[in-house]
């Protein structure tokens, strides 16, 4: 098989938002858990280790619940010889009932699976007293029927975790769900730095509107305060540099699977300078195509 081979026979294509029900199965060590996390990233409600006997009940519940549950993924593994027959029958029943499940089967070469199990010092769930290779062979036999039902076949032999995640997100994720989201948070240093901040910048080098009587009681969300802050020497360079920094790093964050970035801007109390800068920075990031919002942690605390 070629590197990262993904086979998607037939129509319709499972990409986009048309798919409402996904069944994930495949060999142990093949990457089911990574597939599950990737589906969660793009908005699926994921049920892991679901007994195949409950698949129809879960599908009916998801359809009745509506909302986020309409995009449901069920992750199944093999634990008994009855698994393969039961799973094939359950998938056929789902199709006959009109649920239209898309079946994802993850696989990898035997030598790759052996290396993966040895690297984490785990035994194969079906090897018993035998060797790893014995457990893999037993599982392949049990999964043969399920593999034949697959709509999407993913060979993970030459994929790392991030590559597999991106492949699944490309197949099943709406564009909005795959986008990196940036939250620009204003804060006051006297209340502490936001613990979840990925970036922190200090706006206290700018003159403080607190010392301007007509601005003191207003916040950085008010145009008069914002104009005062952004009109100060160095303010434009500060915002532009921070925006350039964030734009330069977002592509790398997306490749690594990061979905949320928090960029913090602080001033003394989190009322004037940091608020104005955060609003302006979020607006500029949106102009470059990023999904950016501004939040003001410490407004109202003074």
UniProtKB/Swiss-Prot annotation:
Keyword S-adenosyl-L-methionine: no
Annotated positions binding GTP: 77-80
Annotated S-S bridges: none
GO function term, MF aspect, one: GTP binding
Keywords linked to the UniProt accession: ATP-binding, GTP-binding, Nucleotide-binding
Record flagged with keyword Nucleotide-binding: yes
UniProt-annotated binding residues for ATP: 26-33
Function: Displays ATPase and GTPase activities.
NCBIfam families tied to this protein: PRK05416.1 (NF003828)
Protein family: Belongs to the RapZ-like family.
Protein name: Nucleotide-binding protein Strop_3101
């Amino acid at each position: 098989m070629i590197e990262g081979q993904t086979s998607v026979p037939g129509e319709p294509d499972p990409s986009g938002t048309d798919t409402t029900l996904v069944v994930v199965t495949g060999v142990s060590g093949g990457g089911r858990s990574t597939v599950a996390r990737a589906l969660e990233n793009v908005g699926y409600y994921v049920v892991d280790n679901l007994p195949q006997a409950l698949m129809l009940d879960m599908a009916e519940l998801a359809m009745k619940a509506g909302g986020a549950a309409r995009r449901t993924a069920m992750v199944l593994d093999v634990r008994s010889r009855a698994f393969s027959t039961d799973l094939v029958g359950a998938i056929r029943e789902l199709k006959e009932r009109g649920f239209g499940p898309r079946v994802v089967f993850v696989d990898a070469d035997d030598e790759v699976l052996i290396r993966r199990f040895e690297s984490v010092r785990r035994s194969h769930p079906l090897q018993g007293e035998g060797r790893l290779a014995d457990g893999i062979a037993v599982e392949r036999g049990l999964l043969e029927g399920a593999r034949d039902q697959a709509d999407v076949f993913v060979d993970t032999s030459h994929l790392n975790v991030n590559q597999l995640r991106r492949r699944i997100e490309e197949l099943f994720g709406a564009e909005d769900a795959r986008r990196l989201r940036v939250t620009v948070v204003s804060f006051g240093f006297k209340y502490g730095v936001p613990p979840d901040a990925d970036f922190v910048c200090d706006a206290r080098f700018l003159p403080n509107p607190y010392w301007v009587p007509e601005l003191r009681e207003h916040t950085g969300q008010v145009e008069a305060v914002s104009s005062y802050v952004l009109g100060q020497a160095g303010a434009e360079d500060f915002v532009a540099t921070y925006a350039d920094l964030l734009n330069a790093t977002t592509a790398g964050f997306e490749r690594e699977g990061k979905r949320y970035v928090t960029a913090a801007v602080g001033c003394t109390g989190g009322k004037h300078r940091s608020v104005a800068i955060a609003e302006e920075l979020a607006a500029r990031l949106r102009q470059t195509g990023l999904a950016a919002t501004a939040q003001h942690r410490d407004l109202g605390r003074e």
